[in-house]
């Protein structure tokens, strides 16, 4: 069942996080024992089957205990144009891979990812390839930080 933005009981193991977008999906990986997220991959394209094939490869490689999906919301917390699509994506992940997918508020992660890349000296034209990965990293780090605070 797709979880809400509030973290559930602690889960041990590897976690994959997704920054869902219409054209790209950023992916990050982290280990719950240490609570640290790392950018992993960007899945480009708009067709579902190649996207899910790439996700299946990552799941086969990393054997996650849990999946996290960023939930896009407006600054005031209301639904965004992609909110329903992100929820559907989380349900599709659960149905295809038999893993729990929890939703985490992703407000401002893309802006924060862009700022982090600029601060690291990455040229703006290079952001597109890694920005979504870094946004997924920030989503997963938010999950870890919320879990630790509870």
Locate each region found by the language model.
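Phosphate- and other anionic-substrate recognition elements at nucleic-acid/protein interfaces
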Residues: 1-18, 22-150
């Amino acid at each position: 069942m797709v979880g809400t933005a509030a973290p559930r009981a602690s889960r041990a193991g590897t976690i994959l996080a997704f920054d869902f977008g219409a054209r790209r999906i950023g992916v990050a990986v982290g280990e719950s024992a240490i609570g640290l997220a790392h950018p992993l991959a960007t899945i480009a394209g708009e067709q579902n089957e190649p996207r899910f094939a790439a996700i299946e490869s990552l799941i086969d490689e990393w054997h996650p205990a849990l999946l996290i999906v960023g939930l896009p919301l407006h600054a005031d917390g209301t639904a965004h144009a992609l909110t329903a699509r992100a929820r559907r994506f989380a349900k599709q992940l659960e149905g295809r891979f038999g893993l729990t997918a929890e939703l985490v508020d992703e407000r401002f992660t893309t802006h924060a990812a862009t700022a982090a890349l600029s601060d690291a000296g990455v040229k703006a034209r290079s952001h597109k390839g890694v920005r979504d990965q870094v946004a997924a990293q920030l989503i997963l780090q938010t999950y870890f930080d919320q879990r630790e605070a509870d």
